[in-house]
Amino acid sequence: MKDKIIRATAKNGMVRIIGGITTNLVNEGSKIHQCTPVAAAALGRMLTAGTLMGTTLKGEKEALTLKINGGGEAKGITVTAHNDASVKGFIGNPYVTRELNDKGKLDVGGAIGKDGLLYVIKDLGLKEPYVGQVPIYSGEIAEDFAYYFTVSEQTPSAVSLGVLVDKNLSIKAAGGFIVQMMPDADELLADLVTYRLEEIPPITTLISEGKSIEEILEFIFEGMDLNILDSIEPKYKCDCSREKVEKALASIGKNELQEIYDDGKNEEIVCNFCNTKYTFTTNDIDKLLKNSIKK
């Protein structure tokens, strides 16, 4: 089944919904970083949140970066997304292992930790990016984003993010949704939506059963005039390039470049997001040095 993100409304626009199946892109990210099951679940939840939230950006050059680090053994996760539903991410320690939690599930909250902040950074092409932050609520990620939307953006929200890791470490199912009540929605509607969300099986169960994201949302919002606005296929996509890495290397300054050149060895730089290796020979470093002197 292809991954898909859809945006929708219910009850004449009183409820705003972004939902998606992200199994393939989470599998891609997990493979790139060689994640353990709990690392795959944590990274996958963040990637899913990123691609869902990224679709709310208006322009192609706008970017959304999400960061969470609660002091746990996962050592933090960062993801970056764009409005075309592309997303990339990395986890500080992809080899983290934890015992199952008291519910018999992967202990994502324990791996992330609670002693830290969740950051939402929106680069909208202005002089300064918008930076929102909240204390980590549970480390389970979905609850943390629900807390962020409610506290930082004053939008009561329900967030579900799920990743089901198979025995062979591939991703069996991944997906999620963000449901937000508009300011003029009445309390009875909010109570009904909350009740529905509490009664449904985990989203990974529904995906594993072969249900599409449309079927899942129609199941949740039955009788609420679900209106699907648009859809897009999300992708794990890194936009690194040799040119960008070269610019970053040049920016470290003439003295540091001279030290690398004097060392007489090739310099290898690895992209955090996709593990692509870029090698710069002493000749390459020499050219960068000469360019820096010209400037």
Curated annotation (Swiss-Prot):
Keyword Ion transport among UniProt keywords: no
Xref: SUPFAM superfamilies: Hsp33 domain (SSF64397), HSP33 redox switch-like (SSF118352)
Subcellular location, record wording: Cytoplasm
A Pfam cross-reference name: HSP33
InterPro entries attached to this UniProt entry: Heat_shock_Hsp33, Heat_shock_Hsp33_C, Heat_shock_Hsp33_N
Coiled-coil residue windows: none
MF terms in GO: protein folding chaperone; unfolded protein binding
Record GO cellular component, one term: cytoplasm
Taxonomy, superkingdom: Bacteria
Post-translational modifications reported in the UniProt record: Under oxidizing conditions two disulfide bonds are formed involving the reactive cysteines. Under reducing conditions zinc is bound to the reactive cysteines and the protein is inactive.
UniProt-listed GO biological process terms: protein refolding
Keywords from the named record: Chaperone, Cytoplasm, Disulfide bond, Redox-active center, Zinc
Disulfide bonds: 238-240, 271-274
Biological role: Redox regulated molecular chaperone. Protects both thermally unfolding and oxidatively damaged proteins from irreversible aggregation. Plays an important role in the bacterial defense system toward oxidative stress.
Family, similarity comment: Belongs to the HSP33 family.
PANTHER family: 33 KDA CHAPERONIN
Name of the protein in its database record: 33 kDa chaperonin
Species annotation: Clostridium botulinum (strain Eklund 17B / Type B)
Lineage: Bacteria, Bacillati, Bacillota, Clostridia, Eubacteriales
